[in-house]
Amino acid sequence: MIKYLSTNISLYFQENNSCLSKKDVLKIQYTLEAILSDLSKFIIIFLVFLFIKEIPLFLFSFIILNSTRPLLGGIHCKTYYGCLTCSILYFMIILLFTRLFPELNTNFYIVFFILSLAITFIFAPCPNEKRPVKNKATLKILSLISLTFWIILFYLSPLQTRNCILISIFLQIIQVIIINTKGVIFNAKNNKTFFNRTT
């Protein structure tokens, strides 16, 4: 459905704008696929959390995700349904951890955040073979700023909010480590198709 919609919309632009080249149309199609894919996944996950009455937690963890992952990088699934499944699992893990995990020793938090900042400084942003990082220094600085912001907020928040921040950062840092040590980078199928057709 997403492929069908993006293809037809991009063809509409092509038919009504003769200035667009084939590559321009493919770029429009790729962008539309990405937007529609992300939007549909957000709506589905939103409905799941609406059903279990955990919308505030979902939105908060979603904000953390979108203020760290685009800067640090992360693992991508090959298919839409694989990504949707992993995304639901990701937010469910955060939900369970947030609600059930007890408060830990202060020293643990200090060590964890120091290691997280160090890993971010050394490895972020993660490499991507299809979309090379051109502004690595800027992204690294922004990654550290984002992480520092959430660490400060962590110490100003109640336990469940702290748990949400902690597990969100942990899952992000784990991805950074995996990508840089094992080379596990799964580019989305539509990324591969688009770049193959435009090279």
Curated annotation (Swiss-Prot):
The chain crosses the membrane at residues 43-63, 81-101, 108-128, 139-159, 165-185. It is a multi-pass membrane protein. The keyword Transmembrane applies. Keywords: Cell membrane, Hydrolase, Membrane, Protease, Quorum sensing, Transmembrane, Transmembrane helix. One of its GO terms (molecular function) is peptidase activity. GO terms for cellular component: plasma membrane. GO terms for biological process: proteolysis; quorum sensing. Its main location: membrane. It is found in: Cell membrane. It comes from the Bacteria. Its EC number is 3.4.-.-. The keyword Glycoprotein does not apply. Belongs to the AgrB family. May be involved in the proteolytic processing of a quorum sensing system signal molecule precursor. This is Putative AgrB-like protein. The gene is cfg02.
